Amino acid sequence: MRKKLLGFILGSGLLLSVCSCSSVKNIVKISDEADYTKIENSITDVYERVSKGCVGVSVSSSTQSGSGSGVIYKYDESSKTYYVVTNEHVISGMTSYSIYFGNAKYSSASLLGYDATNDIAVLTFHLDILNNDIKDSLYVNDIFSYSDNDLVSVGQTVLTIGCPLGLSNFNILTTGVVSSVEATKISTDSAINPGNSGGGAFNLEGRLIGIVEEKEVWKYSTTRGNYITSDDTPIEGRGYFIALDIVKNCIKNIETRKGAVERPSFGMTVTTINTILDPNTSFKDYLPDDGKNVYFVVSSFDKVSAAKECGVKTYDVLLEINGNSINSSDDIKKCLSTITKNDSVKLKVYRINLGKKETKELTITFN
């Protein structure tokens, strides 16, 4: 699991209970309770079906070994090849890969490719004569038959399946809800632990809605005399999975590339300006007078910058990216997570040039 630096806030709450001594005249009777049996049966049915397409991933090199989880997303009948999606950090630095099906059954696997930026990797395997008996029991989560319009909403039930803390805990089910939805990642309170990485996150219809990636960790340090010690505290109820549209795009790129997929960078720093929180911002004179409160301003460039070479200037305000309005920094991040170095990006920017306000459309290339 990857580590994240998290700000820590302590607070206290006071619960007040108000009681009345007067008689209760109006009693609300709940006649239609939720049919929890149907929900439980749905979870059971989904698990029985999709878990047959969830596998363990065993990896090793000459100096280390580890394990994670994965999901079978495709089977090619002509070549008898199964395709498994997992996390890039599960296979990173490893040279040997195996797929685990439970009940002490393994199959050797090959690395088709990976996308380190988005933490996605694809493995392939074939069933040999020793494992051919499990072919009929395997399930393929055909994610490319799903509509891209399927939305994930806060409060939606999430089923996560994986191998937490090792392959001995094969296909363990945990449940929770969607806590928040970002452009590339979705947070959930479903229990996620080391070993869950690369496992599937499903909805109550049994559709894969993402690939489990990490659990949030609060990293802090303590000074004791002349010594500084650091510690990590896992944050319960704060796990993340990669959104399905990002996963699908990565898989397409990996299958085309058959190797490492490199994502480009604009080579610039973009600062988010909120004029309500910071009305006297130093960028104030560079912002358009359009009634908005949040802006994204180019504040600096890297030594090698595709954006600068293609005409972006310091203090430019980013308005659109590929024809879509930029409403959050996630919009920029999502664009960069789905393009390759062979692609180009269209930017619309607002700038003040020699005292004149103007809007420019620029094309960023990365070659």
Label each residue range with its predicted role.
Residues 24-31, 39-46, 208-290:
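C-terminal cap/linker of serine protease catalytic domains
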Residues 110, 252-262, 309-313, 319-321, ...:
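PDZ-domain C-terminal substructure recognizer with occasional recognition of PDZ-binding tails
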Residues 24-33, 51, 74-120, 127-128, ...:
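Catalytic-histidine neighborhood of serine endopeptidases
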Residues 37-44, 56-83, 105-110, 173, ...:
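A conserved glycine-rich beta-strand in the N-terminal activation segment of trypsin-fold
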Residues 71, 192-213:
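Catalytic nucleophile loop of clan PA
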Residues 140-144, 190-195, 199-200, 273-320, ...:
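PDZ/PDZ-like domain segments forming the peptide/carboxylate-binding groove
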Residues 144-183, 218-222:
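Flexible, gly/ser-rich surface segments that form the specificity/activation loops bordering the active-site cleft
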Residues 126-148, 264-267, 278, 355-367:
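C-terminal, low-ordered peptide segments at domain boundaries
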